[in-house]
Design a protein with these regions (language model features):
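Ligand-binding pockets and gating/stacking loops
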Residues: 1-395
Length: 395
């Protein structure tokens, strides 16, 4: 999920106006890294998110398909969380990582802007790779990482015990909120115990810690190792669902490691097509997508590989651009989830179909009966000209 918008001109091959195969097309420079993987790529335009109010960002609404805004809590769960519920149980149902400037990642190592488990229940993104490494692999580490992990674990366990013991005297109006607070500590302590039980297995997947963790020269050093941690969590089976927020769902972001001096809100005030700055950012994104695919391709699963059973969704929390009304919300799919989705093609969705339709289609692919995702019939009369799954993207 890249912030600042995803202009269609940065992903649609020149001259392509109607739905067709990508086989004989040349991908635009920003996504040229995906050229060898065209047969697994599906470029989609024509979906809309007008109802999400995505001008600076739809925030939780980008993955929830509802109106979102800065500082406004989620009004319902998001597609990534619902997927994590539908897929087989894992040690950590859902992992979110967020990439930003070094300063922002250090001062705010966790933020919640994109994912939610329900109304008023945001899911936080991890932005400090040192903290995330300790969480996932601290129990199998040595030296200072192990010491920090044990100290943190002891502290969290003690806080959890104290919190659980002290809540009984609170007024009824505060008990639910306090219960969620206590539940957070129980979740963290429970995860640590579950990870500890499979420590031998995890040793095969833990990334090597290097200077980029403790002494990053640029923010992209942390972006790269966060990606490594996310990939390792998929390969090891720690989680089945990974959400990556590049820009963390806000209007900020920095890529000085790519030679880009401009950062933050100004990046959204420029045209992306044929813009050297955005070519670099989108190429960096595309290289990350390639790395995910290649890593998952290396893991046997069933009669094929993990990538054969994976669907990667690439889009923006700003639809097509900053200050947009969300009338066109471009999406790229990579992989076909064992033949469920079409690939190797470009599709322009006709009519008035919201991003919710894509999300309900994805849920159906994992066995969840869902005609409309987070959209009432009353809302659908205004924002959806069809019903049911998005047939144009199904094989």
């Amino acid at each position: 999920m890249q912030n600042q918008g995803f202009e269609p001109g940065t992903c649609i091959p020149d001259g392509m106006r109607h739905s067709c195969s990508l086989a004989k097309a040349k991908l635009p420079e920003p996504i040229s890294a995906l050229e060898p993987f065209k047969d697994r790529l599906h470029i989609i335009t024509g979906l809309h998110g007008i109802h999400t109010s995505p001008s600076h960002s739809a925030f939780f609404g980008a993955l929830g398909g509802y109106r979102g805004s800065d500082g406004v809590p989620p009004s319902a769960s998001t597609i990534d969380y619902e997927l994590s519920k539908a897929l087989p149980d894992t040690l950590l149902p859902h992992l979110c990582i967020g990439m930003d400037s070094l300063e922002n990642m250090k001062t705010k190592p966790t933020v919640a802007n994109l994912s939610a488990s329900g109304a008023g229940q945001p899911i936080f993104m991890h932005s400090n790779p040192n903290h995330l490494y300790q969480t996932l692999y601290g129990g199998i580490s040595q030296g200072e990482i192990r010491k920090q992990h044990e100290a943190r674990s002891g502290m969290l366990e003690r806080i959890g015990q104290l919190a659980a013991a002290k809540g009984g005297t609170l007024p009824l109006s505060d008990k639910q909120r306090y219960g969620e607070f206590v539940g957070g500590f129980e979740d963290m302590n429970g995860l640590r115990e579950r990870l500890g039980k499979v420590s031998d297995h995890l040793r095969n997947f833990a990334p090597k810690v290097d200077a980029r963790y403790s002494s990053p020269e640029f923010e992209t050093d942390w972006h790269d190792v966060l990606l490594d941690l996310g990939i390792s969590s998929l390969k090891s089976g720690i989680t089945n669902v990974l959400t990556i927020g590049s820009g963390r769902g806000e209007i900020f972001g920095s890529w000085k490691g790519l030679g880009i001096e401009k950062q933050g809100h100004n990046l959204g005030h420029m045209t992306q097509k044929d813009n050297p700055i955005w070519i670099k950012i989108r190429q960096y994104n595309s290289q990350m997508l390639v790395k995910i695919m290649e890593e998952l391709e290396s893991v046997p699963e069933g009669s094929g590989t993990m990538m054969d059973n994976t669907l990667i969704v690439y889009t923006s929390n700003n639809a097509d651009k900053q200050h947009t009304n969300g009338a066109n919300w471009p999406v790229m799919l990579l992989g076909n989830c064992d033949g469920i989705f079409k690939s190797g093609c470009f599709t322009h969705v006709e009519g008035k179909r919201p991003i919710n339709t894509l999300y309900s289609t994805i849920l159906r692919s994992v066995g969840v009966s869902c005609d409309r995702f987070n959209m009432s019939e009353k809302m659908a009369k205004k924002f959806d000209s069809g019903s049911g799954p998005l047939k144009e993207i199904l094989a």
